[in-house]
A protein has these predicted regions:
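Short, small-residue-biased leader/transition segments that mark boundaries at the very start
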Residues: 1-4
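Short, surface-exposed beta-edge/turn micro-motifs
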Residues: 6-8, 18, 27-30, 79
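Glycine- and acidic-residue-biased ligand/ion/polar-headgroup-sensing regions
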Residues: 14-17, 24-46
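Short histidine-centered beta-strand/loop micro-motifs
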Residues: 19-24, 54, 73-75
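Cytosolic-biased juxtamembrane loops and peripheral soluble domains of multi-pass membrane proteins
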Residues: 46-58, 97-104
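Conserved metal-binding segment of the jelly-roll/cupin
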Residues: 57-76
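Double-stranded beta-helix
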Residues: 74-115
Length: 115
């Protein structure tokens, strides 16, 4: 099908919700904080031995996740509202949930609490 140059979604993450480890293989993703509590954004490259955590908040409102990097997120409060912009446009053909891989294929050092 058609591939858009960029696509943006609004994403509301409630207090007890977790955006589980996933990867957009075909495009970079920009996360922009819009409101609520700060959001913990976790990233894990296949080249890394451990996951990194970055706070996305009013003080640090924009962050970038390169194509091919695993990401997960959770709110630090009652809720977090962010926008996620993917370029080139999002396609489920380029999207993968880590839980769909065999455990032996998980990246070394991945934070398993976010599977």
């Amino acid at each position: 099908g058609d591939v858009y140059k960029r696509q943006t979604v609004l994403f509301l993450l409630a207090a007890d919700d977790v955006s589980r480890w996933h990867c957009v293989h075909g495009g970079d993703e920009i996360w922009t904080f819009l409101g609520g509590a700060p959001l913990s954004l976790f990233q894990h490259s296949d080249r890394a031995d451990r996951s990194s955590e970055q706070l996305v908040s009013a003080d640090q409102p924009v962050t970038w996740v390169p194509a091919g990097v695993w990401m997960a997120a959770r709110s630090q409060g009652d809720f977090s509202l962010v926008s996620c912009c993917v370029g080139p446009g999002f396609s489920f053909d380029d999207f993968e949930m880590l839980r769909d891989r065999a455990r032996s294929e998980w990246p070394k050092g991945i934070d398993e609490r976010l599977i």
